[in-house]
């Protein structure tokens, strides 16, 4: 069904003004969802200047040229790690094609920008722009739904990335923009418009582990099966209930996503024990926490402390390292999430993907499926012996994103494997 877009009709004007360019919601005419395939800045299109892009090279270098959850390189990396275990999709010996960059843009108004100063609640993130789209084009386009504070084009090392951001003066303009322009044609490209989110703080600031000195001066609590939405601050706030928290950490992967476990350090043993008694087995956002004493806590000649150690070790057998504990539990979590899930379900938010390369990691799932929409969870389905099956289950927050995932990624060649994707069903 066509959306009423006012002046943005299907008739293309000779004017280069963006308000006269074609803009419709005819999804059947959707061109290939590749930021660089149809317009690579050749001689037929003039290059335009990125006037003052707020996400400049400084931003891209700080975050590895990638923007967090909603801004993955698209299409997903084709290199893939093959079933033989080659890590070619990361640029190794798999022969996978690298990401094609847009044309180099000039910066006549380049300036430094602190991303934390922007009002993300009033901002949108726009994907699949043509490489000659400018901030002025975005401002004029989205100015039809609300007053625009600023519009920007995202670049990487001087190259147009086919993405941009728009900040409005009012929050309600965000939903108006998404409703009106998500999926609409603009400059012959189908736009993908989403709520903008702040970039994660530097991973080293969040994921660095507590030093041995910090642990020696306190009592560590290790928490497994944390909701993936929980960061160190919310973890700290939660565990304040049991005492003064010296430090809280959530373990992140190389993409800056939570790995589902973390730690809290208290100054006293009593606070540590109270936290274990309070939170172990508690359900938070549908996940049951497993809370235990940290491995490196000091042993003290204290009957109560030693008894507590014995009780804990009785419940978990021999004491493995933190990484081993976490890995085992992550496998258990994946098994529970994917248990009884099969392909061929009715329309729902869960996606069943088979024929993945056996060496695909969980973080790869976010790279592959994340650009489509917000993911609640994604897990690889293991065999009973823990070996990979090449199957994953992905839960999207929105049904429309699940629909779009099947439309765009079914039969997609990933790491030399043709993915088979359908709605999931739980038997």
UniProtKB/Swiss-Prot annotation:
Methylated by HMT1. InterPro entries: Nucleotide-bd_a/b_plait_sf (IPR012677), RBD_domain_sf (IPR035979), RRM_dom (IPR000504), RRT5_SRSF_SR (IPR050374). Keywords: Chromosome, Cytoplasm, DNA-binding, Nucleus, Phosphoprotein, Repeat, RNA-binding, Telomere. It is found in: Cytoplasm; Nucleus; Chromosome, Telomere; Cytoplasm, P-body. The modification Phosphothreonine is found at residue 130. Residues 122-198, 219-296, 349-426 form the RRM domain. GO terms for biological process: nuclear mRNA surveillance; poly(A)+ mRNA export from nucleus; telomere maintenance. Residues 22-32, 50-60, 300-317 have a biased composition (Basic and acidic residues). It comes from the Eukaryota. GO terms for cellular component: chromosome, telomeric region; cytoplasm; cytoplasmic stress granule; cytosol; nucleus; P-body; ribonucleoprotein complex. The keyword Phosphoprotein applies. The modification Phosphoserine is found at residue 24. Residues 1-101, 300-319 are annotated as: Disordered. One of its GO terms (molecular function) is chromatin binding. Its main location: cytoplasm. Gene3D superfamilies: 3.30.70.330. Residues 35-44 have a biased composition (Low complexity). Binds to intron-containing transcripts and is involved in quality control for the export of spliced mRNAs from the nucleus. Binds to pre-mRNAs until splicing is completed or until faulty mRNAs are degraded. On correctly spliced mRNAs, GBP2 and HRB1 recruit MEX67 to allow nuclear export. On faulty mRNAs, GBP2 and HRB1 associate with the TRAMP complex that guides those pre-mRNAs to the exosome for degradation. Binds single-stranded telomeric sequences of the type (TG[1-3])n in vitro. Influences the localization of RAP1 in the nuclei. Involved in modulating telomere length. Present with 2540 molecules/cell in log phase SD medium. RRM 1 and RRM 2 recognize preferentially RNAs containing the core motif GGUG. The atypical C-terminal RRM domain (RRM 3) does not interact with RNA/DNA, but is crucial for interaction with the THO/TREX complex. This is Serine/arginine (SR)-type shuttling mRNA binding protein GBP2. It comes from Saccharomyces cerevisiae (strain ATCC 204508 / S288c) (Baker's yeast). The gene is GBP2.
């Amino acid at each position: 069904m066509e959306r009423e877009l006012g002046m943005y009709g299907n008739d293309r004007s000779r004017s280069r003004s963006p308000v006269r360019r074609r803009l419709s919601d005819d999804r059947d005419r959707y061109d290939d969802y590749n930021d660089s395939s149809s317009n690579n800045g050749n001689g037929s299109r003039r290059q335009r200047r990125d006037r003052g892009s707020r996400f400049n090279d400084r931003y891209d270098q700080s975050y590895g040229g990638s923007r967090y959850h909603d801004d993955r390189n698209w299409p997903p990396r084709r290199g893939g790690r093959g079933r033989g275990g080659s890590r070619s999709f990361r640029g190794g010996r798999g022969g996978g094609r690298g990401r094609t960059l847009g044309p180099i843009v000039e910066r006549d108004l380049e300036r430094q920008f602190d991303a934390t100063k922007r009002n993300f609640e009033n901002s949108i993130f726009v994907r699949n722009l043509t490489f000659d789209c400018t901030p002025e084009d975005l401002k004029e386009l989205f100015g039809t739904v609300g007053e625009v504070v600023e519009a920007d084009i995202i670049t990487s090392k001087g190259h147009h990335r086919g993405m941009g951001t728009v900040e409005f003066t009012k929050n309600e303009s965000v939903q108006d923009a998404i409703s009106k322009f998500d999926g609409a044609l603009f400059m012959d490209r189908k736009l993908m418009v989403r709520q903008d989110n702040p970039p994660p703080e530097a991973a080293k600031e969040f994921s660095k582990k507590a030093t041995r000195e910090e642990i020696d001066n306190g009592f560590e609590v290790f928490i497994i099966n944390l909701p993936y939405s929980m960061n160190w601050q919310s973890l700290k706030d939660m565990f304040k209930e049991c005492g003064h928290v010296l430090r809280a950490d959530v373990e992140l992967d190389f993409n800056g996503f939570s790995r589902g476990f973390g730690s809290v350090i208290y100054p006293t043993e009593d606070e540590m024990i109270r936290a274990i008694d309070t939170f172990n087995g508690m359900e938070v956002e549908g996940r049951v926490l497993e809370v235990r004493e940290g491995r490196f806590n000091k042993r003290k000649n204290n009957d109560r402390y030693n008894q507590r150690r014995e009780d804990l070790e009785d419940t978990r057998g021999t004491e493995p390292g933190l990484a081993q504990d976490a890995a085992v539990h992550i496998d258990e979590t994946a098994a529970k999430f994917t248990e009884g899930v099969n392909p061929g379900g009715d329309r729902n938010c869960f996606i069943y993907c088979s024929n993945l390369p056996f060496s695909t990691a969980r973080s790869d799932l976010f790279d592959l499926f994340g650009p489509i929409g917000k993911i609640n969870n994604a897990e690889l389905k293991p065999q009973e012996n823990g070996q990979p099956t090449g199957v994953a289950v992905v839960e999207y927050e929105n049904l429309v994103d699940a629909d779009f995932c099947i439309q765009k990624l079914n039969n997609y060649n990933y790491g030399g494997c043709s993915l088979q994707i359908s709605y999931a069903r739980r038997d």
